[in-house]
Amino acid sequence: MSPLWRLVHAALLLATALLALPAAAATDCVIDAVAAAGFGAYDGMQNDGAMTTITGRCTNTPPPGTGPTIFPVISLSPGLAASYAPRQMTSGASRLNYNLFTTAARTVVWGNGSGSTATVPAYLAAFALSGNQTLAFNNPNLTIYGRIPPNQTAATGLYADTITVTLTF
């Protein structure tokens, strides 16, 4: 066999082997929406609460038992105050303390898992049972519970903060 023929033969074998490899799309998870949480007018005599939800999905997840299992987790940033204890909304130079929690009891601060904060798993519910699946978040804990504590002196104005929602999978 000539050296040229050996090279062509080796290239054909490699091409044939590559064609035989199965192709698979990578799993991808996204957050579809986070509704804005509106506290309304602050009442300095009692806790003010608000709720909002996170919706999302993962695509190209393998059927159970056929590939790696994914465990999406949602974390929240501390916001503009750069602290979870407490978070602060601002209106100009004025500040209003508040926080975001993992449950309606409002006892565990939703954060990034550092200090006394917790992240929340985004359990998945299958939309399809064969082939690669599209899965939606199906977890009652994907509600964010907010609270502004009472007895704060706050100047009149519109208060806001920006929270980054991170999905890790």
Predicted regions, residues:
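N-terminal signal peptide c-region/cleavage motif recognized by signal peptidases
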Residues: 20-22
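N-terminal small/polar-rich segments of proteins
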Residues: 24-97, 130-169
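Bacterial N-terminal signal peptides that target proteins for export
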Residues: 1-12
